[in-house]
Amino acid sequence: MTDGVRLATPRGRALLAATALGSGMAFLDSTVVNVALPTIGRELDASLAALQWTVNAYTLTLAALILLGGSLGDRLGRRRIYLVGVVWFTAASVLCALAPTAEVLIAARALQGIGGALLTPGALAILQTTMHPDDRPRAIGTWAGLTGVSGVLGPLLGGWLLEYDWRWVFAINVPLAVVTVWLIVVSAPESRDEQASGKFDVSGAALGAVALGASTYALISWPEDGASALNVGMAVLSVAAAAGFLYRERTAAHPMVPLSLFSDRTFSGINLMTFAVYAGLSGVMFFIVIQLQVTLGWSPLEAGIATIPTTILMLLFSGKSADLAKRFGIRPPLVVGSLCGAAGVVLLVAVGDGDNYLTDVLPGVTLLGIGLTTLVPTLTATVMASAPQHLAGVASGVNNGVARAAGLLAVAALPAIAGLSGAAYEDPELLTDAYRIAMGVCAGLLAVGAVAAMTLRPRALTEPPTTAPAAELHEHEAAAPAPCSAPGLPPSHGS
């Protein structure tokens, strides 16, 4: 199997299904809970801050540990760590389903994020190191599309499950995990980086986690408590920890994030774009389902169904969008996709003036779907093509950490920017005012993604990454518990 597994073979299809299904669970849980937030708030008597933490506790640990997941896979075996992640994620999902209070649910969501951090980078790294080179771009593009579909499908599935009980939103992961484990065992060979060496960068990981956690706390608490001593202290702590993290990664013998990885212009640019796009997308998915339910009075299922056009478009066409990048280069699909998505969000700003799905909601979600279908597969494939193959897990972990941290900070910051706090989200008029401000910001973030894409060096996906930084990267291979807050530090898809 020196040339890799062919996508057209039964084993290749099983491998793609196993990686898409497992990582899809993690992406699904990034969005499925959004549609359940109003119901969870009522049944567990949760404030807006508690609902934000229900989303962000998961994203926080996912972003904080996702680089560790990539490094562990590169060292101990990508299939092994992927399987551990699936099992851990499933066990935490059961705890979420049984949670009697908002506090217990938040804690279980944090545990769930740990499992997601182990399985998410492993899925992409398994494809990158196992698939035949000729099939790799298409396999990764299809994986990205299917994973994106799972994230967008979250509100629909969540709405349907809420017809029975919100706890099924988490319990549904159990049968999915059983299928995933079976598929990965029968289809994926074990792989690892035999040259990996060095100690885990525990200090770097701790500094990154503190930076992201402290900034998230300050952003969520500020609308209600203002410039309290605790909030100001957390803000200062986050800045100091972020500075300490960057210094540590520059000077450590074995950094968790080799900063020389960012010396590749494409890798740096695509991660900047990832941050902007996933921040915008996470904000859209957080606000749209609440707006549809609270302001328009739609049921959770109706709010979930509203996103179906986006799901259908990604399911039908994501597998082919990577072919566009091979033919025209990476910039056109990335720029066009970001601008289409931004235009779709602009149309969704008007939701609330009327409740006609065909005229008020459908145009926006359709245009957003076209943008994501064009953008996401090319973005993912570009990340992996711009890094040395033996650092596939680290590159995947960095990009996923950027995406998750972006979503984390967006969900924490947007309510504050829009002036929404406490129980104000239950007031349709106050919510609509905040919704429009937040969606305008999200559209702007997607437009920033297009600008970032324009700075990328034109290249086809078949071109190898520059080799200059590769040797240096190998010398400083990342192998530490992941940070969280590095990229400016934030997906999700869209997460």
Set out the residue ranges of the language-model regions.
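Helix-breaking motifs and short loop linkers at transmembrane-helix boundaries and internal kinks
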Residues: 43-45, 77, 98-104, 162-165, ...
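Hydrophobic alpha-helical transmembrane and interfacial-helix anchor sites in secondary transporters
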Residues: 40, 72, 160-161, 324, ...
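Extracellular/periplasmic helix-loop-helix junction of adjacent transmembrane segments
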Residues: 36-66, 104-108, 301-306
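Helix-loop-helix hairpins in multi-pass membrane proteins, especially solute transporters
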Residues: 71-203, 221, 389, 393, ...
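Intrinsic disorder in cytosolic terminal tails and internal cytosolic loops
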Residues: 1-11, 194, 456-495
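12-transmembrane solute porter fold
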Residues: 14-35, 48, 203, 217, ...
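C-terminal membrane-cytosol helix-exit motif in multi-pass small-molecule transporters
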Residues: 136, 174-193, 209-221, 237-252, ...
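Central cavity-lining transmembrane alpha-helices of secondary-active solute carriers
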Residues: 56-70, 120-124, 308-320
